[in-house]
Amino acid sequence: MERVCVIGAGPSGITALKNILDQHLEAVAYDFNSDVGGNWIYSENESHSSVFETTHIISSKTLSQYEDFTFDDFEPDIPDYPSHDQLRRYFQAYAAKFNLYPHIEFNTLVKHCVRENDKTWKVTVEKDGIEKTETFTHLVV
């Protein structure tokens, strides 16, 4: 059975996860944050790479939206250049719409990934001080 590891549940990670699941493959995404959004989750914590509190995207929502879940599907009244918080909520709504949350392990640090001789990946993660190593056939970073 093919088993896929996706590192990160930001904008790219959730679309990768959705498309992998659409192919009926087993998949899990690991993310250091407590929710979907990646760098679009604003935080003053210096250990988290995030947008500035006043950030808005520089491309229009029309050019930045997902084809299978548009901003009009989410919130039609969002301005053409959404704020970081509107984007964060959009990404979280995308994950909810496509039932991605059960496939994401949050508050989880990916410590290292090793390609084995049998062409599998050993991925070691840490959550709440406990390490575990999982084996995957594919790795998406």
Kindly give the residue locations of the regions a language model identified.
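Surface-exposed, flexible loop/turn segments at secondary-structure boundaries
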Residues: S12, D35, H48, H112, ...
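Glycine-rich active-site loop/strand segments that organize a redox cofactor
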Residues: F32-A93
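Structural signal for hydrophobic/aromatic residues that build the beta-strand cores
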Residues: V4-I7, Y30, W40, Y66, ...
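N-terminal Rossmann-like FAD-binding beta1-loop-alpha1 element of flavoenzymes
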Residues: E2-A29
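Feature captures the FAD/FMN-dependent oxidoreductase FAD-binding
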Residues: D77-V141
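Core residues of folded domains in eukaryotic genome-function proteins
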Residues: E2-R3, Q23-L25, F32, V36-G38, ...
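N-terminal, helix-rich and Lys/Arg-enriched segments in bacterial and organellar proteins
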Residues: S12, N19, W40, Y94-A95
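Structured beta-strand/turn binding interfaces of compact recognition modules in eukaryotic regulators
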Residues: G10, Y30-N33, S43, N107, ...
